[in-house]
Amino acid sequence: MRQVPVGTRLVLALAFVLVWGSSVQGYPARRARYQWVRCKPDGIFANCIEEKGPRFDLIAEESNVGPPMTDPVLMRGFPNDFFPISDDYSGSGSGSGSGSGSGSGSGSGSGSGSGSGSGSGSGSGSGSGSGSGSGSGSLADMEWEYQPTDENNIVYFNYGPFDRMLTEQNQEQPGDFII
């Protein structure tokens, strides 16, 4: 019988231990963290700040994206850090208008009989009107997205209002030609 060198036995034993050890431990847990962007626009600039929550383990059997802001670890770490955006930003407006008009008319008539007579008349009129209106608004159309990310820190941010995004997605690209 041929003898196996000692180095080969050592390599085989090490490979067996590594394969057996990895099958016993299972797959490594995936770690994730919630990341979000908070914006306070002031005219020209968006003034956005990227914020991160604590890390947590993703369970393979469950969905990797939970409902926003329902993770107890996240809520325990940052209980007073969130605010409704519509309280800070609101707007109002007003307007008025007026108008005027005029008109004129004339008429004449004659008649005969045992006597004779004639008549004429004229008239004019004018009118005016006015109106006003007011309104208010808030940034309620901003869509907040919270999503857990894996450890590679790949994050997709969406800075625009939700209704504007829907119309922009259906826009024709410069390369699209309609004949």
Swiss-Prot record:
GO biological process, one term: negative regulation of cytokine production
Keyword set includes Oxidoreductase: no
Gene: Srgn
Glycosylation sites: S90, S92, S96, S98, S100, S102, S104, S106
UniProt region (Disordered), positions on chain: 86-145
Transmembrane helix in keyword set: no
Biased composition (Gly residues): 92-136
UniProt protein name: Serglycin
Lineage: Eukaryota, Metazoa, Chordata, Craniata, Vertebrata
Protein purpose: Plays a role in formation of mast cell secretory granules and mediates storage of various compounds in secretory vesicles. Required for storage of some proteases in both connective tissue and mucosal mast cells and for storage of granzyme B in T-lymphocytes. Plays a role in localizing neutrophil elastase in azurophil granules of neutrophils. Mediates processing of MMP2. Plays a role in cytotoxic cell granule-mediated apoptosis by forming a complex with granzyme B which is delivered to cells by perforin to induce apoptosis.
Signal peptide bounds: 1-26
GO CC annotation, single: extracellular space
Propeptide: 27-75
Main location: cytoplasm
Subunit organization: Binds to activated CD44 and to GZMB.
Sequence repeats: 90-91, 92-93, 94-95, 96-97, 98-99, 100-101, 102-103, 104-105, 106-107, 108-109, 110-111, 112-113, 114-115, 116-117, 118-119, 120-121, 122-123, 124-125, 126-127, 128-129, 130-131, 132-133, 134-135, 136-137
Gene Ontology molecular functions: collagen binding
Cellular compartment(s): Cytoplasmic granule; Cytolytic granule; Secreted, Extracellular space; Golgi apparatus
